[in-house]
Amino acid sequence: AISFVAVWSAGILEQASIPEAWKNSGLLLVALKYSGSALICCYLVAGSLPFIEQAFGIVTDISLLELTGVSHPLLQELARRAPGTYNHSMMVAAMAEAAAESIGANGLLTRVGAYFHDIGKMMKPEYFIENITEGTENPHKSLAPNMSTLIIIGHVKDGLELAEENNLPEALHPFIAEHHGTTLVEYFYREAARKADSDHRSEADESNFRYPGPRPQTREAAVLMVADAVESASRTLNEPTSRRIQSLVHDIILKRLLDGQFDDCNLQMNELRRIEESLDRKSTRLNSSHANISYAV
């Protein structure tokens, strides 16, 4: 349509009269020809886009937008098998997108990456706290800390395998692999250390309780790492006031900074500050909203 109007408008300028331009069958034919060519090109580009992305290892905004409708089979299966993880992922996506945009990173890519970052949890959903309903016994009570850690860490490997099997764009794989970096699974490490101390055994080996990594390689993956941790931790606050959330966000970012988790992604200190401010605002709003809903029920 645009091509037709452009060619026909040029004809009007030459003819100096709209009626004369309409009577000029040659001009109309040229306009229609250019319109048809443009339409065919659009179809060819749209049809070949998946092959281009796969060949060059890129993902376009068009493909990402198609994944924002959360109708992908993997997300539908995640919602069915691990509803707590699904809800967590949706909240993390909203937080991470805003934080990424606050530093000029790719918010859309970060949002879609957040949708899929925890898909591996659907393989053993009952072992993740967000899927353990009230009144249900925590399965970790009957497991040694080392075994619990292997299960928790395993969701990253499971997620990458699911991504491969379901042909998720390569650009989304790092969000699955890197969202925990090489961080420590602190709860089970402390449990192992406590048991080792009470049994008068040697100290627990910290390396056995760390994710294998890699650490975030991009700013987008680093943003997701922080947003993921903030959303999970904020749900444990009895009274999620603005001040408590601010302190929580600051502590999470500082801990990961000192642990070297941002060393490979070129994040600047002023960007970390903007990420912190964005997550403060978004977390406060989300927790306030949830508190209101809970109160109403």
Regions found by a protein language model. Give the residues of each.
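Non-transmembrane, amphipathic alpha-helical segments
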Residues: 27, 31, 35-36, 40, ...
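Generic detector of multi-pass transmembrane helix bundles and their immediately adjacent loops
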Residues: 1-79, 83
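Divalent metal-dependent catalytic cores for phosphoryl transfer on phosphate-bearing substrates
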Residues: 75-88, 93-242, 246, 255, ...
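Non-catalytic regulatory/linker segments of enzymes
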Residues: 5-6, 203, 294
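Single conserved hydrophobic/aromatic residue that forms the stacking wall/gate
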Residues: 286-297
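Cytosolic regulatory/linker segments at or just downstream of nucleotide-handling modules
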Residues: 259-281
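A glycine-rich phosphate-binding loop feature that marks nucleotide/adenosyl-phosphate handling sites
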Residues: 2-4, 27-33, 69-70, 109-119, ...
